[in-house]
Amino acid sequence: MNNNFDRSKHIYHNEAFVELVKDAIRFFHGTPVHTLPPPKQFKGAGVYAIYYIGNNPLYKQYADWNRLSYNAPIYVGKAVPKGWRQARNSDNALNQSTELFHRLKEHSRSIAAVSDLDPSDFMCRFVIFEGAGSDMIGTIEAALIKLHKPLWNSCVDGFGNHDPGKGRYEQAKSDWDVLHSGRVWADRLNGIPNSYES
């Protein structure tokens, strides 16, 4: 056992990994843009970005940025394969499910539930990771968030939240749910939300 600590012996760096991440991000930015949700259900898990193109004055800058090309996502997220967190996922095509499509559909329902946003004002793009590539999902999501700093990831937290479930409604509404009220489960939350004045 060595009691001398040298931080440099714990730092991992691999230029090939850095290039792999850059390549995946380049591929992501070249994927087609679709309505939210996409027009057809598909199998797979992966990373996605949501773009705003509507007239809500809160997000006018995003609509302007995305007018000619989709370069400014308002939100970036991921959908992982079933069993991913417990390392029980299968790469077998017969066992693939539709996590990515359903996550995008869930976001569309969240937007439709509020009165001041319209799902038709949102577009999305995504990349599907299969096999060993699914290990990249979290890394690429984090890299895209770091690169774009989407508003609903960085400043207005809570868009991607799920219903916390029975017995867990003592928490406060997220910033997103305070700005855009209407999600039924969020209206059940009893905690005191953050003050916008502080």
PLM feature spans:
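Boundary/linker segments flanking structured domains
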Residues: M1-I74, K78-S198
